[in-house]
Amino acid sequence: MRNGLARLGALALCAWLAACGGGDKPWHATDITGSMPKLQFRMQRANDAEIVSEQNYRGRVVILYFGYTHCPDLCPMTLANLSAVLDKLDTQAYDVAVLFVTVDPDRDTQPVLAQYVHGFAKQVEGLSGPPNGLLALTRRYRVMYKVTKDTPGHPYTVMHSNSVFFFDRAGTARLVTTDTGNIAGITEDVKRLLSSN
């Protein structure tokens, strides 16, 4: 009997320590805090043709995504899902920026990219840059892409990673996901980032 009570007491203590100790609520996306570099770039914003950097977005939660306007499915679906998240955030959405970086700058000129992002939430901004700038940014966040031009002058596809990165108000990389269909979960994550600092 005494051993049974001792065992029960030990289990209760473990449960109490678990509740009081590492009680941080898990994220819906994957926590990458400390494993990826801070937000840093210098590119042209398609919406107004201005040259912008991470400093333009300091104080806002930034969602970073790489794709291209001729993408048949993943890109429009991802941006539509993120737009739905912004809609759920209501007025908090003004403190969020979704940056869509094109990996196909040859076709995604400033007017083309501006028109494309116009079809989504107004917090979605298109970014483009020279090949060396794009390469540096994709390497910084370990994003893979490959342009496949089989026949010169004909339509081509671009293979690319579908990772979506989340940065807090200080520009620190916090989360990554490839599942933007979990709109409620992402909305909850973004709200936590908005209130964290």
Where are these regions (language model features)?
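Short active-site neighborhood of thiol/selenol oxidoreductases, capturing the structured segment around
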Residues: 53-78, 82
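Structural microenvironment flanking redox-active thiols in thiol-disulfide oxidoreductases
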Residues: 77-137
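N-terminal "domain-start" segment that seeds a small globular fold
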Residues: 24-54, 80
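Short loop/turn microsegments at loop-to-beta-strand junctions
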Residues: 38-39, 62, 161-163
